[in-house]
Amino acid sequence: EVAYYTQLGANIHRGVYELSEKASVAYDRVREGVARFIGAPRDSHVIFTHGTTESVNAVAYGWGLKHLKPGDEVVISEIEHHANFVPWQMMCERTGATLRFIPTDPSDGTLVLDNLQQIITEKVRLVAVTAMSNVTGYMPPVARITARAREVGAVSLVDAAQFASHSRIDVTKLGADFLVFSGHKMCGPSGVGVLWGRTAVLEDMDPFFFGGDMIVKVRKSGTTFKDLPERLEAGTPNIAGVLGLGAAIDYLESIGMDAVHRHEQRLLAHALERAAECDDVTVYGPQDADVCGGVFSFNLGEVHPHDTGAILDSEGIAVRTGFHCAQPLMQVFGITGTTRASFYLYNTIDDIDRLFSALERVRKVFA
C-alpha cells in the first residue's frame, strides 16, 4: 500500500500516462496471483471486492435475486458467519424462497450430514457453506456438501474468509461454484476481498453495482457492459488494498500454506492438551486439531467472556470475546458468547502457555 501511494498514486485502466499504466500492470498481476493461490484456471474469474461480506452480497443480489423464486430452497449451515447467513435470509424473504439449514451437533459444533440427501433436494437452487468456522475453527467436509449440490443441479458458494489464511485452497477440490474471502484475515490490508466463480455462474450474474470502467458504451437508450472481470468491478477499486493483498499472498506462498497449517495444528493441539488439564475450561468445537484451523474458543467457568478478555488484555494477550458474528451457532451451544484465541504463523507454544498462565489471574479475580 505504501509503495502504491508513494510511487504510483494513479488510477488503473484509464490513463495512457506511465504511472497509470504501471498501476494497471501491478493490479492485474495481483489478479493472476490470486488465481494461482486458489488454484483457479482463469484469472478473469477473480473479481476484487471490498471484503467477504460484499462478495457474498454480490452473489445474493447478482445471482440470487435473478434466479430465486417461490418454491425454491437455499441451504446454509448453522455455523455460518452472519455475512453468509443474513444475505440469504434477506434474499429468501425478498424472493419467496425457503431457507433451510444443515444442523449442528451441539456437543462439538460439527455439521450433521447423515441426512444430507434429504436436506439438499431437487428444490435447492443454492448451497452456501463455510470452509472453516470462525468460532471453533472446525473445517467441515465442504467437498461432500458441494458434490451433493452438484448432483441436484444447485449452485454452491464456499465462504473461505477464515479458511484462506490457514490452509491451501484448491477451488477444483472444494467443488465450489463461487468462492469468497478477504485480505485482512490473511496478512493483507482491510477493505479488499475476492469473489471467484466458475464461468457459467459468473457470466450468469447481473452486475449489482454500476459505474465507470465496467462499460463498453453508454447511450441514452441503454448501456453495454464489458466482459469479465471488469463487468463486476464498477468504479475506482481499492487499488492500494489489492496490491497489499498481492504482497500478502506472495508472503504466504514463500512460507507455504501447508507449513502454515502444520504449525497451527501443533499450536492448537498444545492448547487442547492444556485445556484438558483444567476442570473449569470449556472448549467449543471438535477436540481434534486435525479437523480444525488455528481457532481456540472457550469459556472459563462462569466468568463472562468479556471479563475474561479484559483481564487477558491487561496481561498483554489479545482475544476476541462475544458471539463472533455467529449468533445461530451460539444458540446451538446454549450460550451467549465465548472467549476466542486465534493462533497463526507468528504464534509460538510459549504464547499458548502464557494464555493459560494468564487464566490464573482471571480465576483469582473471580474466585
What are these regions (language model features)?
Residues 1-367:
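Pyridoxal 5′-phosphate
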